[in-house]
Amino acid sequence: MQAPPRKPDVSGGPFRITSIETQKHDKSRVNIYLDGVFAFGLPRDVVIQQHLSEGDEISEDLIADVLLLDELSRAKEKALAYLSYRSRSIQEIDVKLKKKGFSDRTIQQVVDDFIRVGLLDDRAFASAYVQTRMIQKPMSKRLLKKELYLKGIPETMAGKVIDEIYEDRTELDVAVSLAERRFSGKVNIKEQKIRKKISDFLARRGFSWEIISEVLMNINSK
């Protein structure tokens, strides 16, 4: 786990802001000097928002507030970067930010803000996840529910989303289609060895023995 940035020792005060300098490697952040000594870095937006200027006095309470705003800003940047690869569930964002060392309070604020603006939506995430799965790696409803559960999606929500994506297809339809696509062109698909491979393959995709046996009977009747 990555340790959170060390909090500066700014107990006591009030302090005088003696310098605000743009950071060399990140123009969106500035270094704050109190009484001639470097104290901490902040996003430029926070400095503007809090009307901080050189020569101002700053209290211990205000320092605590701006450091919380800084943590929130950094947490949102991490979350946005994580979301840039693909959509995420609320639980995935929570776990990722915890690993980065952010506080529960900050993580909850990020989640609340992202939900409010539509960047986090567990139902939309679940729907996109299931659609992608059914295109790239079709599987049983049970296995889909398990995968969504591991990503923090409630069982009821997962069930509704999966039923919507499955539409008029049954699990048997999906299993038969999978078996035919995977094992088409085999010399003798009725051969015991091939039938065992079909059974194992469908079991790995989460299908029940009842479904698998129906698939095998379907193949046997052809």
Task: List each model region and its residues.
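An alpha-helical, amphipathic repeat domain used for nucleic-acid recognition
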Residues: 1-222
